[in-house]
């Protein structure tokens, strides 16, 4: 169900210092949150980190709870290069870039995940079940209550058949929980 990437094969192959991208700032209560994407745009562990400040003009401090958004398993992975917004019901959301990489290594899909801020002001992106269809709540909701989404995977590795298939496109790949197969 979870993809693994052997990053050790990449050690020593890059000489340039990576740069963060996709910076985004939001304000919640009296705190500013600067979010940006880390290197790894062609991997399912593409993610965002967050820095906090009391001023929009600076003094941002990287947070020990980083990454603030990460989704390495499930149907589709990656949760980087994001933007965060608040809807009319006061629910926070993150729109993010999810990695596919089938037809091109930079192939993407858009993801939408609920965001919350705990009582200490720590920002959290809730990626669990975020790659399943969901009905957008028409009221304020608790993003930690995963039953609010109404979906649970029932087909993982279930028996599947087809009258015909091409090599590499066998019917069992329809239920393997991987967008790249």
Locate each region found by the language model.
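Hydrophobic core segments of beta-strands in well-ordered, beta-rich domains
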Residues: 21-40, 91-100
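Structural WD40 beta-propeller signal
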Residues: 26-28, 85-87, 118
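Repeat-solenoid scaffold signature
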Residues: 70-110
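Structural motif
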Residues: 43-51, 103-112
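A contiguous binding-surface segment within folded domains or other stable secondary-structure elements
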Residues: 37-41, 45-74
């Amino acid at each position: 169900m979870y993809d693994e990437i052997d990053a050790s094969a990449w050690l020593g192959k890059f000489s340039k210092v990576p740069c963060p991208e996709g910076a985004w700032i939001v304000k919640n209560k009296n705190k500013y949150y600067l979010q940006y994407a880390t290197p790894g745009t062609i991997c399912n562990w593409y993610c965002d980190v967050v820095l906090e400040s009391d001023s929009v003009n600076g003094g941002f401090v990287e947070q020990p709870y980083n990454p603030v958004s990460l989704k390495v398993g499930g149907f589709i992975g990656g949760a980087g290069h994001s933007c965060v917004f608040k809807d009319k019901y006061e629910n926070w959301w993150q729109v993010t870039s999810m990695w596919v990489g089938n037809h091109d290594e930079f192939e993407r899909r858009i993801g939408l995940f609920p965001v919350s801020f705990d009582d200490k002001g720590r920002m959290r992106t809730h990626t669990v079940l975020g790659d399943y269809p969901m009905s957008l709540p028409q009221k304020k909701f608790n993003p930690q209550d995963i039953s609010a989404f109404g979906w649970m995977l029932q087909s993982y590795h279930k028996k599947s058949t087809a009258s015909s298939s091409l090599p590499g496109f066998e019917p069992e790949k329809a239920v393997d929980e991987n967008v790249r197969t």
